[in-house]
Amino acid sequence: MYRVPEFYARRKRLGGQTPYLMDQLGLRLGMWYWKDETRTLEFRRFAAEDSVQWLLKHHPHFTPAAEVKEKGKKGKAVHFAETDGPASDRLTDKRLAAKDDKSAKAVEKRGQQGTITLDDVKFVTLLLLQDTEMQRICSFTTFMRNKNLDNFLMALLYYLSHYLEKNSLEKKPKSYMVGLVEKKEMELVLSELEAAQRYLAQKYCILVLGLAVPDKHHMCCGKEKISDTQKDWKFFESFYTFCTYVAWIVFRRQHLTEIEEEVGRLFRTNMFNIPRRRREDEESGGEKKRMTFVQFRRMMAKRPAIKKAINMRSPVMSTLLPSLREKAQNVFEKKYHQVDVRFPAEMQKHVGTLDSVPMPVVGILGEPRCLFNPHTLHPLDPEENTKSFGRYPSLMENNNMRIQDTLDLVMKTLSSHTSCPK
C-alpha cells in the first residue's frame, strides 16, 4: 500500500488547524494598502484559503508540492511618490494658485451680492482708522461684534439722520410769512429728534454701565475696588472717534464737521467738547490774543467751578438723569413753548398712526453692494453722492406726505363744521 509522505500529512493537518489556531491566538493575516479617498493606510484581512497559502509559502519547514496559483489581489498597490523634487513643487504651487484664484473670485462674487450692513461699515471704519488711531483702536477691536454696540450705533444713526434733516430745514430760504406746512414739518422733525435722543440715551447708559462688556468697564462692573481712569479714557475716546467715522461713512462721507460737532456735544460737556473749542478757535482766527485782566475774569466767569464741572452731565445723560436745574428748565420750556392745539379724536388717532410709521433706510445701509466699492464703500458712480438716498424715499418726503394727510383731515373737519345748519 502506498504510504502518504509525512510532510504532506503535516501540511494537511496544518491546513485544517490554521484558521482555528489563528483565531485562538488572536492573529490575523492580511495586507496593508493605501486608500486614496481617506488618504490613510487600511488593513484588509485575508480569507481562510489565502491565509493557509501564505503560511505554507513562507513557512521554513514546508515546501508545497505544486505552486499555488496566486489569486488577483483586490487591494490597491501602495505607491509612495517623492515630494522633494522641483516638479512636485511646481505642481503644488499651480494647484494652490488655482485654488486661491477660485476662492478669491468666489469671495468677490459673494461680496457683490446682498445689501450693505452695519458690519460692513464697521470693518471699513476700523481699516480707515488703523493708520491714524492705531494705538487707541487696537484696544477697541475686541468690542466690534458686541450686540450692544450695534444697537447703540443704529440709535446714533437714526438720531443723526433726524439731526441732518433739521439742519437742512433750517438752511432752507425762509419767506416772510412762514406757512403752516413749514411749521408742522419742523415740529415733526423736532419731536422725532427728541424721541431718538431718548432712545439713544438708553443704549448709551448700557455701555457706560458695562452690562455686557465688564472688561471695558473702569471697575470691571464691581469686581475691582479701584477705578482705572486711564483705561476708561482710552476706551471712550476711541469709541467716540469710531462712532463719528461710522456715521460719516453711512451718510456717504458727507457732513463730517457737523457729525463730529454733534457727537462731541452729545457725549461731552461744554468744558470737554474738543470739536467745539476747535471751531471757536477757527472763528476767532486761530490767533491767541493778549487779554487784559478784566477780559480774563469775564472769560473765566463763563466757565463753571471745578466742583461743579465734575458733577456736570452730558446732554445724552441728562436726557434720562437730569439735574434739579435741568428739570426746572424743562418744566419752564414745556409750560411756555407748548402749542395749545386740540384736534378731534378721529384726527388724533390718525396722527398717532402716522407717527408710528417706521423710518426709511439710513444712509447707505440696505442699499445693494454692487453699487459700492467693497473695500472703501465709495459709490462706483460719482453721481450717486449727489442724489439723496437714490430710489429710497427720504425722511423729508415721508414728512411731507404725513403733513399733507394731516392738512386734508383739518380741511375735512372744518368743512364739516361750516356745512352744519345753524
From Swiss-Prot:
Keywords of the record: Protein phosphatase inhibitor
Coiled-coil residues: none
InterPro entries: Pro_pase_1_reg_su_36
A single GO molecular function term of this UniProt record: protein phosphatase inhibitor activity
Function of the protein: Inhibits phosphatase activity of protein phosphatase 1 (PP1) complexes.
Subunit structure: Interacts with PPP1CA.
PANTHER family: PROTEIN PHOSPHATASE 1 REGULATORY SUBUNIT 36
Protein name (database record): Protein phosphatase 1 regulatory subunit 36
The organism of origin for this protein: Homo sapiens (Human)
